[in-house]
Amino acid sequence: MTDYYEPINIFRQCAISVKKRGQEHGLDVATRRVASWQRSAKLNSPTLRKVSDDYFLTKKVKSDYWQVSDMDLSATAFSSVGNLVMVTSNKDQDNVKLYTYAEDPNSMRQLQTITVPGAPITTATLLPAAEFNPTAYVPDHEQLLLTGHRDGIVNLISTSFTKGESRIVKRYNHRKHLVSMANEVMNIDTKHKDEIEQLLANHKQKSNSARAMPVRSIKPWNGMGFVSLINDSLFVFTLNNTKTPQYLNSFPGIQSFAIQTHSNPYLLGLTGTHFGANNIALLDLKKTLYIPDPVIDKEYRKSSSRSVSSDCTWISSCYLAQALGKEVNIWDVRRTDGKPKAKILPNKGVIEHLSYHYETDTLFSSDDQGNIIAWDLTNLDRLEYCGLVHGLDAVKYNMNLPINDSNYSQCGNVVVNGNNNSACTYRKLARKIEVNQRAGTLFSYCDHELGLHRLFSAPVEISLQLSDTETINYESEEEEVMVHVDKLHDNSHENSSILHSDSTTLHSRDFDSYSDNESANTTDNDNELAYMDTFKRPVPAFLDEKVAAYNNPVLSSSSSTLAYGYF
């Protein structure tokens, strides 16, 4: 037994793996396998392409356009589900057309033409077959759709592509509910009863006219019904109940609504002129009919009270995007301070339509000048202000906002430029947009033109053409660095360009020419010092040695020191 403490011998797994050593001439020699990625057979693998410097990826857009209606008649609405597209017009005959498109090759083919009787169509939408079963109403039918008319009627239509037949299976009359609601309100006892009776009498007289009840918007709701907007009244109908709506309320000044389809379809976002200074409110269909007044910030009220909110869309279960004039505000519904989570700065025209693609976290906006812009909101949690990637608007800051490099992101790319010779530009019309969630494509419609837009990453090769350059080889124990240095001009006031091995371009000047020349002008020295201060860093040492390399062509590798990766 030993006279010192010895721990218990417990088996432990090695943390590292050591290769076996071979015996050569009685000495332990470690076997080493030298491999290079240049001799690898996977030169075209995605992993190696990411670290190479001969190309870079850029976002590009591919657009296809089709003429789907007559030049003298404009379409009233369009909708898309899967590879199916519907376009409606205000004609009496053939006012609903269904198309199908294929991505490879890009083609658009007309499936069916439907004539819906009654008043002109003002809006329409396709119902997803996965949520709304068309065979529950008519056997062997493949698609359900809703059409809203000028007289306040909404028709549920079932159609079959194979048989070529269509049928109106349900009809929802909104006008009669608005008239009965006005009669009930007239029985309210108030000191302003005479004025209210006069207003409601005028409202009732207008309600009897078919032209006073256009259906402004229709959206599918919770796989069982739809939400519709007529004038200032919001309806919620189930498809099986045509007599009584599940919900009905009037919101003066309402412009649009958005249904939260992620987790709570009973939560709606509303935009309008009477929803506080921010022109936005939340509506919970499960709670009492009450819209709380938001907390208004004085500074924010001055900048937003003059704008009109035209559209909104849900980004997630907590974030709601709102078009407010030329800006887009992204709200966090969990906050109560009355300030947006992020703001897309003003650009182009007044934004009228919004659409969001959930898989790629891309928000599309359309303005009254025919422009469509895609906003990358992947890092939404860290965003405060968003701007365009290209153009003068990308670098133009609003001096009234606390914008800096840390909270500003250039994430906007122009998909459709409104400066082209299109009908939307001449007539100042906004392109109606809708994202196909399954295919990830964007549909746009303006006047008679239907567009299909797709964003993709395209590789761009890098070709560097350097003239009058010298090559300095720097050898070390670990690697060999090749640095291309442009020749310095004799005129010290001219700029020279230095290209490092990491493809970073730095514009500098010949600083040593001023320090060696005692007769230099004081004004020039001040200008050069001010130019140096813009870098906010000390001048690298290799700039001095670069000048020495030009004056003395013989430069030993041992005396050169390169600040690799300094900038």
UniProtKB/Swiss-Prot annotation:
GO terms for biological process: cell wall organization; invasive growth in response to glucose limitation; regulation of pheromone-dependent signal transduction involved in conjugation with cellular fusion; septum digestion after cytokinesis. InterPro entries: WD40/YVTN_repeat-like_dom_sf, WD40_repeat_dom_sf. The keyword Mitochondrion does not apply. Involved in cell wall metabolism and required for the separation of the mother and daughter cells. Belongs to the WD repeat DSE1 family. This is Protein DSE1. Coiled coil: none annotated. It comes from the Eukaryota. GO terms for molecular function: G-protein beta/gamma-subunit complex binding.
